[in-house]
């Protein structure tokens, strides 16, 4: 399925390109450079003082003195203070680059952005309609904000246990059902792209949400590079989304934990802007990392001016997919995306590999490649591996293919196949019924019970298999036998991890007390 570029909504500036000279600027990073070049006697935080002396010697040996010199505190003249500060100019350039009305830099990752979004839309009303495969950080935000959720289920690839997206028709039906149930949505939250690169019809979803009187929030964490090359999907902010969470560090080149939040141009932005600003202020650190913010400034510059390099990444990823198609041991998951009406495009920088023909678990294969070959894939399922190619990068994908082939042909793989044949892996479970609000369940009187006794009880925790971090269970949901089996299988798999679990093996569940 080829990526498509729908037309941006009226009044939105076209994508920034290398021809836009302003996008070559990095005002905030340059301001840090100027500050670091000054002769200084720092008698303030941070305690390392910008050098490798005293207690900081080991730190300077570890990362070098340059990061210490650039690690300046907040509220500095000629850096982040004032209406026309270097920071404010960098934020304006980012908004322009992604087609937003306004952009915020985040140093708590897209997880902070999701919590901000939940807090902000609470100012519009208590009811939110959320894609059930939303990231666990949005579930955390729903709980914190006291939102009342209802859900729209994504399409599911049952062969691979993969959740994709939501079509405009499915969203329309879900919004109508919520309204008929007396819980008309005050906001809508969807995910695009998915963890496997499936891109939803954001423009169509925005039209549906707006027709029902609700803003559209898009968790675009996995698509920070969208809009910066003709062969990439468009930025959601240009397609009518009211708020877009963007995890710039994932594929956009900034440092880990840095992200952005974009306010779009939809009919709700005037109401949302002050709410978002207030939510940012109560979720952000009062000691924001200058290094993380500078990395966002530079990543924006690199994306906006780097179409040629991004094109090379796309060519490399396409060649990797072609090689996998020619290898009978593997397949490409996105080749089957045409069967799902919610998918209108594919992220070409994400290569989802079908390993079912090889007869090995994706979890085993991912761990084997990391341990033996130093090749690290983003995530795995029982039948797949997902590779990410950072925008502008051209890793040695031929070597990765050779290592994949060698791993599945190894004696260890044969031993693993016999175990897989004997035991298999549980299917992705359907969510249990929501029996009480997440907030009420979280703050209820709770107890820990063995996994076998948890079936039929109400969860007090959010439990999410990582990666990708989609909650398999949220506070207030009934715990099903299928969910217990799935989470325990994930916890027991190579590199398996369940966020929010009471113990590493998911042997106990925290539930609300009976009576």
Task: Please name every model-derived segment.
Residues 1-66, 464, 468-471, 500-502, ...:
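N-terminal glycine-rich, Lys/His-bearing helix-loop that initiates the first secondary-structure elements
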Residues 18, 28-31, 37, 82, ...:
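Conserved PLP-enzyme active-site core in the AAT-like
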Residues 273-277, 294-303, 344-349, 379-385, ...:
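Short acidic (Asp/Glu) and glycine-rich catalytic loops that position anionic groups and cofactors
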Residues 102-104, 246, 374-378, 497-498:
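A short linear hydrophobic-aromatic micro-motif
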